[in-house]
Amino acid sequence: MKILMVLTSHDQLGNTGRKTGIWLEEFSAPYFLFRDAGVEVTVASPKGGQPPIDPKSDLPDNQTEAQRRYKKDAAAQKAFSETARLADMKSENFDTVFYPGGHGPMWDLAESQDSIALLESFYNSGKTIALVCHAPGVLRHVTYQGAPLVKGKHVTGFTDGEEAEVGLTPVPG
């Protein structure tokens, strides 16, 4: 099995002056789950190379076993720091696509024509699309047969209540 993990390249939290990016736990936990199951994992981002990490996700109080493992695992660090360019990825080369969250995907991946086309291709091929936390926001412009892909579907993600708990309401533009 081959999984494509798509990470954000966006590092600014709207117009707040704060940094954002990938929420590290949302990369590290599934990455190790996939890898430990013998899945071939490819990591990509719009710009390729090192994606930004949301600094809050790497605070001592937010450390998880997966993050501690990541910090000791050279192969995981290399996969993360040397992401492929999203524009070079094709759905026919993978069985599924996985988008971790953090706020970053709502800016670059939701608007990226490469991301939109990739998601539409996965969906049209009957392949699994997995999105965590804020990542469902990447479906904003994804369509199926001319209608929004999410029309008539139930989608879960990070809630407005959770945003309020972390002091980010309204979500900055």
Predicted regions located by residue number:
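Short, thiol/selenol-centered motifs that function as redox-active sites or metal-ligating centers
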Residues: 132-134
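Extended, subdomain-level signal for the structured scaffold at the beginning of enzyme domains
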Residues: 1-125, 137-173
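Conserved, well-structured core segments that form or line functional sites
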Residues: 129
